[in-house]
Curated annotation (Swiss-Prot):
Record keywords: Sporulation
Protein name, UniProt field: Small, acid-soluble spore protein P
Annotated source species: Geobacillus kaustophilus (strain HTA426)
Location in or out of the cell: Spore core
Entry superkingdom: Bacteria
Length: 48
């Protein structure tokens, strides 16, 4: 059972270790969102 937990923990750790890689795509999405936000800045009411 402990082994299974360890494996699961390792799997969970894998994505955690990929955190530096995850923020990369997130940053890209944020950049796109930011771009949209800037464009929607005129439509702030709509964004709200």
């Amino acid at each position: 059972m402990t082994n299974k937990n360890d494996g699961k923990d390792m799997r969970k750790n894998a994505p955690k270790g990929d955190n530096p890689g995850q923020p990369e795509p997130l940053d890209g999405s944020k950049k796109v969102k930011n771009r949209n936000h800037t464009r929607q800045k005129h439509n702030t009411s709509h964004d709200m």
